[in-house]
């Protein structure tokens, strides 16, 4: 009986060392050597080298000279009241909930007031509430507003949108999307 206890204790210790120490260390080293950008959060820096965000997490843009992101039920976990570990999630409001309808109507009105034709992803938040992309159609809907605010030639703005449009994953999965943060940084750096 003692022998079985010692064997099980050794097995537990060995598995713990393998799964809690050795395996994570190997994954960490491989990640840092093979995929350092992704392993460190896909961080994006500005022209001064300051980190301004992640390519994987959206941000709120409200100024006229910027492309606007999707609405976020959690406000992209920004601000003083944001959880330090970050949060994600949708509003979980039912389609019949009047609060959801009010939010969508207010967003549609804001877009129309700014001469932007509402598209689905400019009206509805994503499931995670952190989506960094808008559709190419949503970028085109904001084209005139941004071009006017920045006094940028249309062909130059169209070129920037095209450059920052990411295709389907492996050519077949998902939909093309425009990363709003990288597009807005490109506008600032032009």
UniProtKB/Swiss-Prot annotation:
InterPro entries: KdpC. It comes from the Bacteria. GO terms for cellular component: plasma membrane. GO terms for molecular function: ATP binding; P-type potassium transmembrane transporter activity. Keywords: ATP-binding, Cell inner membrane, Cell membrane, Ion transport, Membrane, Nucleotide-binding, Potassium, Potassium transport, Transmembrane, Transmembrane helix, Transport. The system is composed of three essential subunits: KdpA, KdpB and KdpC. This is Potassium-transporting ATPase KdpC subunit. It comes from Synechocystis sp. (strain ATCC 27184 / PCC 6803 / Kazusa). The gene is kdpC.
